[in-house]
Every structure is written in C-alpha cells, then in structure tokens.
C-alpha cells in the first residue's frame, strides 16, 4: 500500500469488505468520501457488494451516506432499488436524505414499488416520512409505478394497499391525465381497481 495508490486501495478494501484495511487507509489520511470514476464512494461500493459490516464501519467513521454517484445512486437508493432490506436497516438509523431522487426523479419508495419489493415498501412506510406522492420525471407517483410497471399480482396488490393506507392519493394522474383506476382497469387489474375504489377513487 502506497500513499499514491491510497484512494484506489481504500475503495477496493471497501468493496471487498476489508474493514481493517479501510481503517488503515483512513488512518493514513485518505478522504473518507473519495470516489471512483463512476462517482461511487467507499460506502456506496460496500453497499453494492453487500459488505454490511463495512457499511456500518464507514457510517460510524462519518462517511457521507447521501453522496450520489454518476447514475444518482447512493446506499439508501440502492437498498430500495435492489430490495436489500438488510442494507436499508443499516442505513435508516443514519438518517439518510429521503428526498434524494433517482435519475428518473423518484424517491427510494418509487423503484421499490415498481419492482415489487414489498419488504422495502413496508419498512419505508412504517419507519420514515418518505413522500408517498412524489412525482418523477415521467409524471408517475409510487402508486402509479406499482400499477403500471408490474403484473398486478398479490405482491403489487399489497403494495397498493399499503400506499393507500399511508396517504397515497388515488386521484393523482399521469402526464396524460389518466388516473390510477383507469390505468389499473386498462391492464385488467380488477383487484387493484377495487382497492382504489375503496380508497375513494
């Protein structure tokens, strides 16, 4: 390990979950938030490679958990996108910025709803004040994504129900003026349509 290669050694150590080496690099003065060419910091790399103990060690050492890479990802958004509940439960106590958005303009809840990550949706709605009505760059809320971008199955029905119970509006339309109810019916998702009607749609 040389001072010249310190940033690269540090980032690789985080990716590999080598906490001792990470601590040595920090003791030698490496910038805790240094990043690679993709803009990924050590804590983002540790998160990506599910090096959970290393993620916690970097949080404890004061790493910036909100810094986003060139694709707008950070540990919090990564946990939501990938359905990584273990990572989310490590990150939430560190108080991540819930208003950080993906490159599509959605908060962490949005991709979790789209991809059917029910456990992530439950965790976010139970333990945070995340915006359930955030509209992304294409005009979709988490509720609309849960309907439009998945299969309407049991998991998606549960996500829709949770969103409605936590204040998601059944009236917010997409950019073409279509309501969640119209979009659910267009796709033949009658169970979801009934949930929306019960919520006042």
Regions found by a protein language model. Name each.
Residues 21, 53-54, 86-87, 119-120, ...:
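Conserved ankyrin/ankyrin-like repeat signature
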Residues 1-28, 37-40, 198:
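Intrinsically disordered, low-complexity regulatory segments in ankyrin-centric signaling systems
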Residues 23-31, 56-64, 89-97, 122-131, ...:
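Ankyrin repeat domain, specifically the short helix-to-loop turn at the C-terminus of the second helix
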């Amino acid at each position: 390990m040389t001072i010249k290669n310190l940033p690269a050694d540090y980032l690789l150590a985080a990716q590999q979950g080598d906490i001792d080496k990470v601590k040595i690099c920090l003791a030698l003065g490496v910038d805790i938030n240094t990043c690679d060419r993709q803009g990924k910091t050590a804590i983002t790399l540790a998160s990506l490679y599910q090096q959970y103990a290393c993620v916690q060690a970097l949080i404890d050492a004061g790493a910036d958990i909100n810094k986003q890479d060139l694709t707008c990802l950070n540990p919090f958004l990564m946990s939501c996108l990938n359905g990584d509940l273990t990572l989310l439960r490590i990150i939430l106590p560190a108080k991540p910025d819930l208003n950080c958005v993906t490159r599509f303009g959605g908060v962490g809840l949005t991709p979790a709803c789209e991809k059917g990550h029910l456990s992530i949706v439950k965790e976010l709605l139970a333990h945070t004040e995340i915006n359930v009505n955030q509209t992304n760059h294409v005009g979709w809320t988490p509720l609309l994504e849960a309907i439009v971008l998945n299969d309407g199955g049991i998991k998606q029905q549960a996500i829709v129900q949770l969103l409605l119970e936590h204040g998601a509006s059944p009236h917010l339309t997409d950019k073409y003026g279509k309501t969640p109810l119209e979009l659910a019916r267009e796709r033949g998702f009658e169970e979801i349509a009934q949930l929306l009607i019960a919520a006042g749609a």
